[in-house]
Amino acid sequence: MICYKGKVLTVDSNDTVAGFLVEDKGRIVYVGNELPEQYKNVQTVELGKKVLVPAFVDTHQHMASFSTFHAGLNVMDAESNEEIAQMVKEFVKSSGNKKTLIAFGASPYSVKEGRLISREELDKVCPDKEIMVVKYDGHACIINSKLLDKLKGKVSKLRGYHEDTGEMNQEAFFECSNYITNSLSIIELFKNMQSAIDFQASHGIGCIHTVSGVGFTGNLDITFEKIFAKSLTNGFQVRVFPQSMNVDVALKRKLPRIGGCFECALDGCFGSHDAAMNEPYIDSLGGDGVLYYDDEKVIDFCKKANRAGLQIEMHAIGDKAFDQACRALKAALDDYPRKDHRHGIIHDCLPTEEGIKICRDYNI
């Protein structure tokens, strides 16, 4: 049992700042300004200039993906593609018997070349092992020739396929992601997830909303994350959102919620130039992005999920996708009104006035 003395931010409805917090084996047993007699001989930690706050909640995380990336190579701090190539070269040397490697964090905006590392550059430092370098936004990747040769038959006809640079976007990226996730063993995934949880807890995160269904066969990651969450004994909380447009994926696993990105993504993202826009992009590429589904499909999904009593989340970054999400949720709630539905739209980087009005009127 430990007593913390100092500034304790409770973050309750009144924003109360208490002077004492007592915890016993991870459970808070007292919070207040006067320390009760039974706790006066408890070991005390003086906070001094520090402040005790509740654990943070990460409300949108792809846990299986984050765990995999966390165990791989992080290139986010690289200032050039030459530096990334050198990091990959060293990573290959330390990879042992692994046949497939993963790196994360490539960005054309943080390197002096102003572009993503290319397939040719990856081939020079990693010719004999498959490698996928995931872009910082998680919506695209660059693969080397070894991996391209393995997947060419599956990705060459898909949207977002760029053989010359090795960059994969849209459906081509999803196919690459599916291959990578299915190359992981259950034991390896479990170890990676435990390491990722420990890492997040060490940075003050105590709860995550994980959006699962990132390409594992049979949506294994959804089931696995649910089981993994129940196995945690340190108070860390996990809320699982299955990324599926099939309501049964949630209901069969007795999950009260559904949605996220991947299959529930209505569009892409700005970094990959595929966020769906009401007006065309004004750069040289032009276009208005990618809207993955028509209204009919999204509305049908929302109606089924809402009638099943599920909480719904959908990815919408561009304003065109945001409007579509709002229309679909409105149609679902008009069809079957619910007071405490807790439906939400993820990201919504460019909300429109019309969409905001729907959100306000329907408590989205």
Predicted regions and their residues:
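Long, K/E/R/D-enriched contiguous segments that form extended
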Residues: 267, 301-311, 319-324, 350, ...
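Glycine-enriched alpha-helix->loop->beta-strand junction motifs that scaffold or abut catalytic
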Residues: 255-259, 330-332, 358-364
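Divalent metal-binding segments
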Residues: 2-4, 9, 13-24, 28-234, ...
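Conserved helix-loop functional segments at active or binding sites
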Residues: 304, 328-335
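Non-cysteine beta-strand/loop elements that form the S-adenosyl-L-methionine
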Residues: 62, 257-274, 363-364
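Carboxylate/His-rich catalytic cores and anion/metal-binding grooves
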Residues: 143, 246-259
